[in-house]
């Protein structure tokens, strides 16, 4: 695995549960089409898996 992961929010969080919104905030994704670069760790991977239907992930 690479040391970093690029994550882009491609679907809106409007109408989603508070837990999904909390995960997106934890990843630093607040607006659509925002891209963040995160360290590749099991914690980050778990958060990505929880909201994968809203994200685009680049290794």
Curated annotation (Swiss-Prot):
PANTHER family, per the entry: LARGE RIBOSOMAL SUBUNIT PROTEIN UL30M, MITOCHONDRIAL RIBOSOMAL PROTEIN L30
Species this protein is from: Geotalea daltonii (strain DSM 22248 / JCM 15807 / FRC-32) (Geobacter daltonii)
Family: Belongs to the universal ribosomal protein uL30 family.
Protein name stated in the entry: Large ribosomal subunit protein uL30
Entry GO terms, CC: cytosolic large ribosomal subunit
Keyword vocabulary terms for this entry: Ribonucleoprotein, Ribosomal protein
Pfam families: Ribosomal_L30 (PF00327)
One term of GO molecular function: structural constituent of ribosome
Signal peptide as annotated in the record: none
A GO biological-process term: translation
Subunit structure: Part of the 50S ribosomal subunit.
HAMAP family: Ribosomal_uL30_B
Entry coiled-coil feature ranges: none
């Amino acid at each position: 695995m690479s040391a970093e992961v690029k994550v882009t929010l491609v679907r809106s969080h409007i109408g989603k549960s508070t837990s999904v919104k909390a995960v997106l905030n934890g990843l630093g994704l607040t607006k659509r089409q925002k891209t963040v670069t995160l360290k590749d760790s099991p914690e980050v991977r778990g958060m990505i898996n929880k909201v994968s239907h809203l994200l685009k992930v680049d290794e």
